[in-house]
């Protein structure tokens, strides 16, 4: 399998979708590590890349000698999550990489791990899990706001983005459900989601449409205010 990296060039104000254009740049083959790659995440400077492997049931870590340039990537290590989840899908980190979060649809949980040092999966240890089964039986992607007091899980069964609050940032044991936003008009099998820095733009990828759907949020990181 190959990871295809699309560089989206946005105007800093994110005023209109006309200001964004996707241009194919390069690809990087990860088939030696996994044949069913799922979510893709970078560290802040792009010198580390992480890919969820559903076949291997693990998180694969790569280094990039040039940040965000996949042609410079090389495999480092992997971390097996099968003791907690046999169908891992989505992945997220806190800001310094000392916490890693994995969501999967075997147990329908967001799993929390500690890493020391940050962004080094070889040091990961399991901490806790938070069930999202009441909201969706096929959770496939997740994201947090900047301080970890909000968590978002996209679900393939109900085709929505579920929002949670965390009373302690990046601590899933303190999570509680808030609201959901339906994306079925745009995508009937959503896979993953990302936000811009202030949460006023949300991007949802989908299997059926094979595209990236963009939404505006009049209140940052509040899905009840989202519009396509």
Segments the model singles out, each with a brief description of its role:
Residues 24-31, 74-82, 125-133, 176-184:
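A short beta-strand motif characteristic of beta-propeller blades
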Residues 18-20:
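Boundary at the C-terminal end of the N-terminal hydrophobic targeting segment
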